[in-house]
């Protein structure tokens, strides 16, 4: 049985049961809904972040509280859920990009080519009708041959 919250300090008793508790049992976790004992970030004990695996401090919004989003960094302003993946949690992201692979750092530019078969061709200079190869991404080289 987990003790209920007592003001600003909570009891740690019962926190090793491996299940989410109705009442908080860890410090800084006195919220309506508690995190599971596997939560290691106190700020992740917010109700919206009470998932099996907790998010990091910078990634505690409801849509980002999945295991795949719990990375060191996350993009809160990213408009697509696929940008919550580890490879997409970068400084910049392109929400309107049609391909999940375009959420990689090199692809998170103003323009992107969703139909581009080469991930490195998602850079601005390579967003042409026909994509270049990875080693041939100059504007004048985005043709059928490089």
Swiss-Prot record:
Q: Which GO terms describe its cellular component?
A: cytosol; keratin filament
Tell me where the sequence repeats sit in this chain: 5-9, 24-28, 29-33, 34-38, 44-48, 54-58, 59-63, 64-68, 69-73, 83-87, 88-92, 102-106, 107-111, 121-125, 126-130, 131-135, 136-140, 141-145
The answer to whether the entry has keyword Transcription regulation is no
Which residues does the annotated region (18 X 5 AA repeats of C-C-[GRQC]-[SPT]-[VSTL]) include? 5-145
What tissue specificity does the UniProt entry give?
Expressed in the hair follicles.
What UniProt keywords are attached to this protein's entry?
Answer: Keratin, Repeat
Q: Which InterPro entries match?
A: KAP
Acetylation as a keyword of this entry, yes or no, is no
Record-stated family: Belongs to the KRTAP type 4 family.
User: How does this polypeptide assemble, per the annotation?
Assistant: Interacts with hair keratins.
Its job = In the hair cortex, hair keratin intermediate filaments are embedded in an interfilamentous matrix, consisting of hair keratin-associated proteins (KRTAP), which are essential for the formation of a rigid and resistant hair shaft through their extensive disulfide bond cross-linking with abundant cysteine residues of hair keratins. The matrix proteins include the high-sulfur and high-glycine-tyrosine keratins.
Q: What is this protein called?
A: Keratin-associated protein 4-1
Q: Please give the organism.
A: Homo sapiens
Taxonomy, top ranks, is: Eukaryota, Metazoa, Chordata, Craniata, Vertebrata
């Amino acid at each position: 049985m987990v003790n209920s919250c007592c003001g600003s300090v909570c009891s740690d008793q019962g926190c090793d049961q491996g299940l989410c508790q109705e009442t908080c049992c860890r410090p800084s976790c006195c919220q309506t809904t508690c995190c599971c004992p596997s939560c290691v970030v106190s700020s992740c004990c917010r109700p919206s972040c009470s998932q099996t695996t907790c998010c990091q401090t910078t990634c505690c919004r409801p849509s980002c509280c999945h295991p795949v989003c719990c990375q060191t960094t996350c993009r809160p302003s990213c408009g697509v859920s696929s940008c919550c993946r580890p490879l997409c949690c970068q400084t910049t992201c392109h929400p309107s990009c049609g391909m999940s692979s375009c959420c990689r750092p090199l692809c998170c530019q103003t323009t992107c080519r969703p139909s581009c078969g080469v991930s490195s061709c998602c850079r601005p200079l390579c967003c042409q009708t026909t994509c270049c190869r990875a080693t041939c991404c100059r504007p004048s080289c985005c043709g059928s041959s490089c």
